[in-house]
From Swiss-Prot:
Subcellular location: Cell inner membrane
Reactions catalysed, as given in the entry: ATP + H2O + 4 H(+)(in) = ADP + phosphate + 5 H(+)(out)
Source organism (scientific name): Methylobacterium nodulans (strain LMG 21967 / CNCM I-2342 / ORS 2060)
Topology in the lipid bilayer: Peripheral membrane protein
Site entry: Required for activity: 370
Assigned keywords, A-Z: ATP synthesis, ATP-binding, Cell inner membrane, Cell membrane, CF(1), Hydrogen ion transport, Ion transport, Membrane, Nucleotide-binding, Translocase, Transport
Name of the protein in its database record: ATP synthase subunit alpha
UniProt: ATP binding residues: 169-176
Biological classification of the source: Bacteria, Pseudomonadati, Pseudomonadota, Alphaproteobacteria, Hyphomicrobiales
EC number: 7.1.2.2
Encoding gene per record: atpA
Family: Belongs to the ATPase alpha/beta chains family.
Cell membrane found in the keyword field: yes
Subunit: F-type ATPases have 2 components, CF(1) - the catalytic core - and CF(0) - the membrane proton channel. CF(1) has five subunits: alpha(3), beta(3), gamma(1), delta(1), epsilon(1). CF(0) has three main subunits: a(1), b(2) and c(9-12). The alpha and beta chains form an alternating ring which encloses part of the gamma chain. CF(1) is attached to CF(0) by a central stalk formed by the gamma and epsilon chains, while a peripheral stalk is formed by the delta and b chains.
Length: 509
């Protein structure tokens, strides 16, 4: 038998070298039961609320219910591979997602994993999904406009940077279309070099069909808008915990821009589905149900999410995060639980109606029920000057239109009011994917409120608008530029605009 001394000494040296090293300790628990996307785990005594845990199969979960003898874990993935008796280990980290400019142009799931097949995400940092909203001191009141490119919104229900404006309506009333047009309207700013004008877009799709999300992404891509957008998708086929988490993940990604002195808008489409997913999780975790079987903290779920949208003061970098949550109502019932909750949290709502949609008023905004509680402070002076009248005139028109159904013989003043109102309603219609710049909206609305549309038949209003815009873009680009640069309609610009509109109105027909 050949004994090699060198070999033995090498083995001994190796053993001596490793002597006294601590074994790696991970805290583990055991699965007691699993089903419906919920696992009950025994033994994770020191686990934190909201901590990520990992199952043997590699699937991750989040500890939500910390009870005396077990932990209720919601599973971010399929629970088919998880069996009773398997071990579960703590990760020691609260749920976080990658954030940064590297996510722009990408489609990710609720945990920030790419689902668009374009390779791994290059993130600058990771952030917790559920953090406290900024306090009162670092904030500043909303004062800059967030242009949507839609006449009916920018003129009547203006939105400011840092505001939370709810888009509410039944299914198929064009809620997502408003959000999509808002994203497309940011393209000119991103083509320019002014960093402050740029608005990054985050779109969170919750509980939607995959085909719908794919179509949305394709429209963004075709219009060159995906490069400044992030899409977070938790589709209908994803587990409820993913649908619950997606808005928080999107918010963390949006907060990166807010906290670094940039501006972002986040669209939650839609929060009704997030509430349903949260209700499902809560009931399976045996939390006591409340009104409409939602858990008692469903208000807190939405308030803590929407409070994170803010306009920061100069000391905090002057960034902003604007939120456009979407809520789907059933048969125009705004008094249901979730709609009333979100209406009370947000700074105003854009109310869309099925009847208007089918009458051909698109976007189908009900101007009477829609409000913006803080947006008027952010409206540009030029828009304020022309849009001030339109609100009053439309309100009178609605009142008179209801009244005129009863009487046939109307006096001239009432008839004039009805004519003006029907033309202004026609003027506020706008086809999809054609957002207008602020200065173009000002010119068009100026023509409407100053009576230049009154002699024109209602069905020719659209042609008048197109013609006027073509004239302005072609021969009077300097006038549009003056309004855009000053954000005001000076006496000189107003006189010039009056001349252009008058001349065009004479030649039109």
């Amino acid at each position: 038998m050949d004994i090699r001394a060198a070999e033995i000494s090498a083995i001994l040296k190796e053993q001596i070298k490793n002597f006294g090293q601590e074994a790696e300790v991970t805290e583990v628990g055991q699965v007691l039961s699993v089903g419906d996307g919920i696992a009950r785990v025994y033994g994770l005594d020191k686990v934190q609320a909201g901590e990520m845990v990992e199952f043997e199969s590699g699937v991750r979960g989040m500890a939500l219910n910390l009870e005396q003898d077990n932990v209720g874990v919601v599973i971010f993935g399929v629970d088919r591979d998880i069996k009773e008796g398997q071990t579960v280990k703590r990760t020691g980290a609260i749920v976080d997602v990658p954030v940064g400019k590297g996510l722009l142009g990408r489609v990710v799931d609720a945990l920030g994993n790419p689902i668009d097949g374009k390779g791994p995400i290059v993130a600058s940092e990771r952030r917790r999904v559920d953090v406290k909203a900024p306090g009162i001191i670092p904030r500043k009141s909303v004062h800059e406009p967030m242009a949507t490119g839609l006449k009916s919104v920018d003129a009547l229900i203006p939105i400011g940077r840092g505001q939370r404006e709810l888009i509410i309506g039944d299914r198929q009333t064009g809620k997502t279309a408003i959000a999509l047009d808002t994203i497309l309207n940011q393209k000119p700013a991103h083509e320019g070099s002014d960093e402050k004008a740029k608005l990054y877009c985050v779109y969170v799709a919750v509980g939607q069909k995959r085909s719908t999300v794919a179509q949305f992404v394709k429209v963004l891509e075709d219009n060159g808008a995906l490069e400044y957008s992030i899409v977070i998708a938790a589709t209908a086929s994803d587990p409820a915990p993913m649908q619950f988490l997606a808005p928080f993940s999107g918010c963390a990604m949006g907060e990166f821009f807010r906290d670094n002195g940039m501006h972002a808008v986040i669209i939650y489409d839609d929060l009704s589905k997030q509430a349903v997913a949260y209700r499902q999780m809560s009931l399976l975790l045996r939390r006591p149900p409340g009104r409409e079987a939602y858990p008692g903290d469903v208000f807190y779920l939405h308030s803590r999410l929407l409070e994170r949208a803010a306009k920061m003061g100069d000391a905090a970098g002057a960034g902003s995060l604007t939120a456009l949550p979407v809520i789907e109502t059933q048969a125009n019932d705004v008094s249901a639980y979730i709609p009333t909750n979100v209406i009370s949290i947000t700074d105003g709502q854009i109310f869309l109606e099925t009847d208007l949609f089918y009458q051909g008023v698109r976007p189908a905004v009900n101007v009477g029920l829609s409000v913006s509680r803080v947006g008027s402070a952010a409206q540009t002076k030029a828009m304020k000057k022309v849009a001030g009248k339109i609100k009053g005139e439309l309100a009178q028109y609605r009142e008179m239109a209801a009244f005129a159904q009863f009487g046939s013989d109307l006096d001239a003043a009432t008839q004039r009011l009805l004519n003006r109102g029907s033309r202004l309603t026609e003027l506020l219609k706008q086809p999809q994917f054609s957002p207008l710049k602020m200065e173009e909206q000002v010119a068009v609305i100026y023509a409407g409120v100053n009576g230049y549309l009154d002699p024109i038949p209602v069905n020719r209003v659209r042609a008048f608008e197109d013609g006027l815009l073509a004239t302005l873009r072609g021969k009077h680009a300097d006038l549009l530029e003056a309004i855009r640069a000053s954000k005001d309609l000076s006496d000189e610009s107003a006189a010039k605009l009056k001349g252009v509109v008058e001349a065009f109105a004479k030649s039109f027909g």
